[in-house]
Amino acid sequence: MQLFASLGIEVVDISINAIGDAYAFKSREMDFTVGAIINIGSETTSVTLYNKGIVVKHSMLQLGGKNIENDIAYIFKVNNDTARKLKEKFAFAHKNHASQYEFIEVSNVYGEMIKVNQFEISEIVESRLEEILTIAKKEIRSLTSRNIDYVIVTGGTSNMANFNYIAKEVFGTIAKIGNVKLIGIRNNKYSSAVGNIAYFVSKLKLKGKEYTMVSADMIDNLISVENKNESYDSMLGKVFGFFFSE
C-alpha cells in the first residue's frame, strides 16, 4: 500500500489471482458446475476450486516452470537463460509430435557447442509437467470429495505446444487449456492480471459507474490534431505494448 501511495496511486480495492483466473475464463458452464483452475507460474502452481464460478478453496504448490528449466539446465549443462529459451522456443510439453531428427545447437556452461534433440528435451519437459499436474490432481482431491466437471490449466507454461496432450493424460476429457481472449491478449501468462481487470469492470458496472483506462487529458491528446501522428511511445502505447510485444 505504501508503495502505491508513494507513486500517487490510490488503492480502491484488493483482489486475488484466483478471482482473476475465474474471470479470464468465465463461461455459462462455470456458473452451474464445480471445477478447478490450475495456474502454473514460474516458481509456484496455484490450485483453486470453484463452485458455480465462486472461489471456495485455494492451495499453492512449490513447483512451477522454473523446475522445468532447472531440469533442462542440469541435464544439458546449460545456463538458466538458455534453458528457458529451449523450453519456450524448442521443446514440446509432450513428446507426441516432437521430432527425433530435429536438433538445435547451443553453448553449454563450458563454452562448448552441443546439440539438443527435440524429442529428448520434450521427454524431460513432459516428465516434470506430469509430476506437477499429478500433484495438482491430488491437491484437488484433498480440497473436495465432489466430482469435478472441468479443469482449466493456465499460466505461461501452458502456452507450450502439445500441452493439451499431457493435461488430458492426467485429467482426462474434463481438462482444457485456458485461452485468454480478453482485450486482445493471447497469452495465458497474463490470465490472472487480465481477469482481475474484467472483475473490477464488472464491479463498477454493478455499481452503475463508468470506467476508462486513460484520463480525460490523455484522451484529448490522443484525438487532438497536433498529436494524431504521435508514435506509440506514450503511456497507452507502453501499456498495450507490454502485452502485445511478444
Residue positions per predicted region:
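Glycine-rich phosphate-binding/hydrolytic loop that grips phosphoryl groups
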Residues: 176, 180-221
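Phosphate/pyrophosphate-binding loops at sites that engage ATP/ADP/AMP, CoA/4′-phosphopantetheine
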Residues: 133, 137-149
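Nucleotide/phosphate-binding catalytic cleft detector across ATP-hydrolyzing
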Residues: 1-35, 79, 85, 93-111, ...
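Short, solvent-exposed amphipathic alpha-helical segments in soluble enzyme
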Residues: 30, 167-172
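Residue-level signature of catalytic and energy-coupling elements of molecular machines
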Residues: 4, 39, 72, 136, ...
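Glycine-rich phosphate-binding loops at beta-strand->alpha-helix junctions
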Residues: 94, 148-168
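Gly/Thr-rich phosphate-binding beta-strand-loop-beta motif of the actin/hexokinase/Hsp70
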Residues: 28-57, 72
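Glycine-rich phosphate-binding loop plus the immediately following alpha-helix
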Residues: 1-7, 13-14, 54-88
